[in-house]
Structure formats: C-alpha cells, structure tokens
Amino acid sequence: MRMLIAGGGTGGHVFPGIALAEEVVGRHPGNDVVFVGTERGLEAKVVPAAGFPIELIDVKGLKGKGILSLLLNLLLVPRALLQSHRILRKWRPDVVVGVGGYASGPVVLVAWLLRIPTAVQEQNAIAGFTNRVLGRFVDAAFTAFPEAARHFAGRKVYQLGNPIRRTLMENYMRPEVKHPRPRMLVFGGSQGAHALNMRVIEALPHLADLREALAVTHQTGARDREQVEKGYRACGFEPDVREFIHDMSAAYAGADLVVCRAGATTLAELTVCKKPAILVPFPAAADNHQVVNARSLVVAGAAVMIEERDLTGELLAAEIRAILTHPERRERMARAAGRLGSPQAAKEIADVCAELVRRRWGSPAGQERPGHGPVRPPDLA
C-alpha cells in the first residue's frame, strides 16, 4: 500500500501524520508513504528528518485573512490544484489522508476527483476549517474527541484517537518510575510559549521552599531561554533549561507533572505516557479548540486547566504545589490519564485505510497492482 499524507504547518498536524506513516511502513515491507506540504510549514524540516519523502506545493491559508491577503492567496489555489494533480499522478497512491492545515485541501480534493480513496484525520475537539470542508467529500474521518464528530457525516466517522510517535508509545507499557525527587516538565510547544514561560518564573518565589526537593526540565524556545534560566537561578533552583527538547520520550518518562499547552497531539502524548498535567490552553487557537480539548482531561480527573487570562504566578504555584506534594493525587491523575490513552490509534487508522484500499482497488493492502508497485521514483530512491 502506498499512502500519501497531506497537510501540516504545525507539529499538531505533522507529528500525527509521521506516527501514521511509521505504522504503515512498519507493517509490511512493500508499503511506503510520501508527504505533501509547504515550504513554510514545519513538515518541510521534520518529515525528511523522519526518513520520509515530501513534495511541496504553493498554497496559503484562506481563513482569518484580510481582503487583500485573501484575494492574493486565492490566486494560488489553481496552481496548487495543478501541483497536486502532478504529484498524485507521479506517486499514484492507493489512499490519501489529510491531516489538517491548508496544504491538505487541494491534495485531498484532487485525489477525490481522481477517485482515489480519501480520509481526513482531525486531531482537535473542534474540527479545523480545511477538514470541515473536506469532510463533505472524503471516505473516512478519523477523530480523537467525540465533539468533532458533528462536523462529519456519521457513517464515515471513526473515533480512534490521535496517532503518536513510536518512541512515545513505548512509554504506555513502561512501568511507572519512582524518582528520588519529583520532576516537573514545562513546555509550550516546539517554539516555546512566552506567556507560560513568564508565569512559571513568577511562580518560583512561591515555591522557594521546594527548590531542594523539586527537579525541573523546561523547554523555553529560543527567545526566552536566557531569561528563564536566570529566573530559576535567582530563586535558588538548578533547572534543566533547553531551547528545544529533541527526545520527548525521555522527557515524559522522567516527569511527574507536566505544565503545557493543550494542543491535541500534546494531550494524546500525555494520556499515552500517563502524566498528570496543568494545562494552559493557547488563547489564540482557532475556535478556542484548546480549551475544549483540555476539558476532556479535566473531566476525567487527569489534568487541571487554567486559562491564560486567569493565570498568575501565585495561582500556578498553588496548583503545582497541590499536585507535587501529594503523591496519591499524582497517582490518581496518572491513572486517569492512562485510561484516556489511545496507544493503538495509528494501527487502527491504518487498518481502516487498508480496508478503503481493498474496496477501491480490489486487492489486499500492500499488494502490487498492474503498473503500480511500492517503488519510489528514481530521484528519491
């Protein structure tokens, strides 16, 4: 089976796609996956680093733009459709999956016109604009939250969770590690989060009595690294401050509490890794979807949510103290998070895609069809 995964822009779209790709290529030696994205998106860097080929198209978002920007971006659509057609003819995929982001729109639409099986994977509780549009056409819509189902026709919705990377999935089966000191992991996404960084620093004076008992790993992004590290040291903490954490599996494994945003991929990782969390949703997220995402963990007892407008150093410190100084509460939250985890999401999504392939092409997933086999084009061999 050859799968084409389209979309990206942010890690929340890209990393579930990579997790699905890992599952597809890992289940059969004849399977392969190609991505389609844009030069500006995160996918242009992380997809090749993950070992997958990527094609780039010229397209920009249409939602939330001024009139001039909207008109200019609309002018790119015909070209993006032609580029998508060329890519689909070149790779001849058995199935096309859109993972959200504006790059997925033209590719999935052209695939549908070519009668190639199509699907979308919606990571959030409130479906994004592109997925809502594509949901009218595709053969399947994979969701992680029950709230997202209302955006798609019921017969095609599969609530299977968000795929996560294999290295993180290993944490689901890993026994709970008892650390000599509780460790707090703080991160705001791949670029960091300035507001979250600053509120954590403001919380430290209220946690000064815990400085010998608390270990901290903090991903700041490039902008705030120096200021954050100085803030910790001024309060007597010896933190592990980094611009970017490359091995999130190890970071999660070493954490007893996570303070972070509420993107869908982050929440999927928290639940599979069984980590209690203090969630600070990104206030500018489309349709306020991070708040809706976070509520599912809060209701289950796996997390505490503080909206950014309410976040102060004193309040954050109080929540950190209430969780880290009560091991029994941490354990309850960890168990609740684990019950929400979907470690088989990538496998189950790949299973449905394989069935779409069988129905359309009349051959088992991974089996070659005349004129189409699992061979990469010569320039990417």
UniProtKB/Swiss-Prot annotation:
Keyword Acyltransferase: no
SUPFAM superfamilies the UniProt entry points to: UDP-Glycosyltransferase/glycogen phosphorylase (SSF53756)
Cell compartments where the protein resides: Cell inner membrane
Similarity annotation: Belongs to the glycosyltransferase 28 family. MurG subfamily.
CDD domains noted in UniProt: GT28_MurG (cd03785)
Annotated binding of UDP-N-acetyl-alpha-D-glucosamine, by residue: T10, G11, G12, N124, R165, S190, I245, Q290
Protein name: UDP-N-acetylglucosamine--N-acetylmuramyl-(pentapeptide) pyrophosphoryl-undecaprenol N-acetylglucosamine transferase
